[in-house]
Amino acid sequence: MAVGKKLVKAREGIDREKLYAIADAIKLVKERATAKFDETIEVAINLGVDPRHADQMVRGVVTLPNGTGRTLRVGVFARGAKADEAKAAGADVVGAEDLVEIVQGGKIEFDRCIATPDMMPLVGRLGKVLGPRGMMPNPKIGTVTMDVAGAVKGAKGGSVEFRVEKAGIIQAGVGKASFSEEKLVENIKALADAVVKAKPAGAKGTYVQRVAVSSTMGPGVKVEPGSLNS
């Protein structure tokens, strides 16, 4: 069956105008996650912000209680004892000038990037490479830190970085279709709570405007925002 026909069939039984309670929405999404691989469950949160204004930027990191189901490759820019700590904590790639050269050459072998503060003048050279990928280390989300071991373990243990996009939307993977409904709901509520706590001072009016959940290959299901309150 062609992908288009599969999507049309998957939409059957979903009221496109209804706002579902989060548990009901997840049930519908899981029932329609029928691909031959373990689909990622994704959340899209529309916020009442304009990220073009610095005082309306929303970003942060949250550790999902049940993990993401994905194994992240973690790269760390550090020297000496901190480099050793990163390796011991399970970092996939650790280096300093040597790692900068590798990344500048277009070889990025990590999904999350962490750096000690003293490395940032060096890492700053990679802004044009890491910035567009959303991978530039940032102290606000704990990826510029002296606690490299804790940051590596957090990344490996299910922490998710979120950042509002130009259209005012935050999108994040919160688990796999193989997760139980209960675990997915817990993860989504944890993400929503972190997004609410990251509300910027410049946000006006309704902050969380729309929420939808979907699987990698499945249709979106609209969610009643109030059902995300823990």
From Swiss-Prot:
The keyword rRNA-binding applies. Gene3D superfamilies: 3.30.190.20, 3.40.50.790. GO terms for biological process: regulation of translation; translation. InterPro entries: Ribosom_uL1_bac-type (IPR005878), Ribosomal_uL1 (IPR002143), Ribosomal_uL1-like (IPR023674), Ribosomal_uL1/biogenesis (IPR028364), Ribosomal_uL1_3-a/b-sand (IPR016095), Ribosomal_uL1_CS (IPR023673). GO terms for cellular component: cytosolic large ribosomal subunit. The keyword ATP-binding does not apply. One of its GO terms (molecular function) is tRNA binding. CDD domains: Ribosomal_L1. It comes from the Bacteria. Keywords: Repressor, Ribonucleoprotein, Ribosomal protein, RNA-binding, rRNA-binding, Translation regulation, tRNA-binding. Part of the 50S ribosomal subunit. Binds directly to 23S rRNA. The L1 stalk is quite mobile in the ribosome, and is involved in E site tRNA release. Belongs to the universal ribosomal protein uL1 family. HAMAP family: Ribosomal_uL1_B (MF_01318_B). This is Large ribosomal subunit protein uL1. The gene is rplA.
